[in-house]
Amino acid sequence: MHMQRYSSAAIMNLHRSFLARQTPIMKTKMVNPFIESKKACDVFINHRGIDTKRTIATLLYDHLSWLNLQPFLDNKNMKPGDKLFDNIDNAIRNCKIGITVFSPNYCKSYFCLHELALFMESKKKVIPIFCDIKPSELRVVNNGNVPLKDLERFNLALEEAKYTVGLTFNSSKGNLSDVVKNASEIVIESLIEMESEQKMIKSSRNTPMAL
């Protein structure tokens, strides 16, 4: 399955349309990521650090920031002394969209799977990027240290993510800038769609019922 693709001109129009909805202060202020980590973010980037932090995850964060969006990446938005689970869980519950970068060592991380499960439990839209791994290869690793309740959460979340249309990237053949650009375009499209849906819901609630 393939995601709907837009021309570059259409994407630029979508981006301008999205920014036009933001307040002037949002578009011009200098952002302190440590302060913004306490607030709602547009996009939470879920990834395995040893695989993708120095590549696709950081490039995504930088590109989304350049687009005047508010992404969340643990090493960018958190500082020494912050409580890990409190900050991560709060950011996920308050984000608008999640990007999950699946990679060969992803399923070995309790934190990665916890974040993914929280996405699904919070009913967030998740954009999967399968980096050097196929969806069919993703399996929860049970080393005996994970509580049964969490194993069930992780398996359910992983199965849902595996059957969600996403992007694929092969680091030996692909171009990082292409997958970053494509993922960013999907984020913008999704944010605009979500905003339109929210406006329709709000409008319907404010419309008086005919007698």
Where are the predicted features?
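Cross-kingdom TIR/SEFIR domain
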Residues: 65-66, 77, 85-182
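Conserved N-terminal substructure of TIR/SEFIR domains
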Residues: 2-97, 121-124, 182-211
